[in-house]
C-alpha cells in the first residue's frame, strides 16, 4: 500500500460508522466514506464539534455548517490548494494522491530533459500543479468548466500560474482520439477517471465500460521516450491487480516497470490506515 503520510496541513483524525473525521487547515469536517464499515468509540471531541458535516439524505445529501468559510487554503509542501465544500461530499482535493505527486515529481525533476504531461480527468488540478511545479509542461483536460477554473486558481496559489499549462474543457476520450489524429505525443500521462460521470455534452462515462479502451488509446500518444504513466481508480470492486493487467496488456512492453497498490491515509487516533482507492504506476526506462 502507498500511504500519504507527509501531510502537515491535513489529517485524517478518526473513522467510524461510515464516516471519516478530517482536519484541513484549522477546520474539521465529517464526511461519509463507503470504506468505513466499522464502528469505533468516537472519543475524539471533534466528532461533536466539527465545523461542518455532510449527511446523506435519500439519494443525495447536504452539508450542515456550524462554523466554516466558503473556502480556505491548505498546503502540501510547496503546493497550495483551495478547499471549498461542494455537492456530493467533495471538497476539491483528494489528499491520498499526495503520495503519487511525490513519486512523479521526483521522476520529472530527474529526467534531465523537458517533460510534457497529459493529465486526463484532471479535476481541480492537484496533479497538474504538482507536475508543473516540478518543471513539466502540462495539458489539463476535464469535462467540468468549474473544476478547470478551480485548477487555474490552484496553479496561481502554488506559484505556477504563468507556467506552461494548457487548460481544456472536453470529453477526455474524444480529446485523446483527436490528439492521436493530430500526431501529438506526451512523455507522461496521468489518468484519474471517475467511476461514473458525464462529459460537457452529456456523454455518459462508466469506468468499467471505458477503461480498457482508453488505456489502449494512451499507447498511441506516448512519446518515443516516455517517462511514466499513472492510472488512479476509486471504483469499489476494481482491484489494483485488475487495473495492472489492463495496463500490462495495453501499454508498450519494452523498458518498463509496473507497480499496482492501494492508496491509504493513516488516522491520528490509532494509526490504522484507511483505504482510499488504488493506483497503477508505470515507469519507463528506469531500473
Give the residues covered by each predicted segment.
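S-adenosylmethionine
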Residues: 172-253
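Conserved SAM-binding loop of SAM-dependent methyltransferases across substrates and taxa
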Residues: 124-136
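S-adenosyl-L-methionine
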Residues: 144-190
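Conserved alpha-helix/loop element of class I SAM-dependent methyltransferases that forms part
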Residues: 95-113
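Conserved class I S-adenosyl-L-methionine
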Residues: 113-123
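Non-catalytic substrate-recognition/targeting regions of SAM-dependent transferases
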Residues: 6-22, 29-95, 102
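Conserved SAM-binding motif I beta-strand of class I
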Residues: 137-142
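C-terminal catalytic and target-recognition region of SAM-dependent MTase-like enzymes
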Residues: 226-287
